[in-house]
Amino acid sequence: MSQPDVEVLVKPECHLCEEALKVTADACSEFGLQHRTTDISTDPALAQQFAEEIPVLRINGAVRDFWRFDPQRLRRLLREASGN
């Protein structure tokens, strides 16, 4: 199975974004996965869509979490997306 596309949507000066990125990086490293970060302030459509929900976790394009990411839930989501 191919590696899931794990993306965290963030914006500048967002303390929840910093926390979410750490939780995501830690969980992804446990599974040997990569994640990417997208700054919504550089994309007006994303900024309009997600302005009130940042940070947002998307796995394979689907929104799976927002605001505070629960590490246990994230691990479960990554396990499911990885087919493990």
Q: Model-flagged regions — what are they?
A:
Residues 1, 30-32, 51:
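Short, well-ordered coil/turn elements that cap or connect secondary structure elements
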Residues 2-26:
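Local sequence-structure signature of Cys/Sec-based thiol-disulfide redox active-site neighborhoods
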Residues 19-22, 49-52, 69:
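Generic recognition of short, well-ordered alpha-helical segments
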Residues 21-38:
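Conserved helix-turn-beta segment immediately C-terminal to the redox Cys motif
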Residues 36-53:
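Thioredoxin-like thiol-disulfide oxidoreductase module
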Residues 55-63:
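A short, hydrophobic beta-strand/beta-hairpin element that forms part of a small beta-sheet core
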Residues 62-84:
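Non-catalytic, surface beta->alpha helical segment in thiol-disulfide oxidoreductase systems
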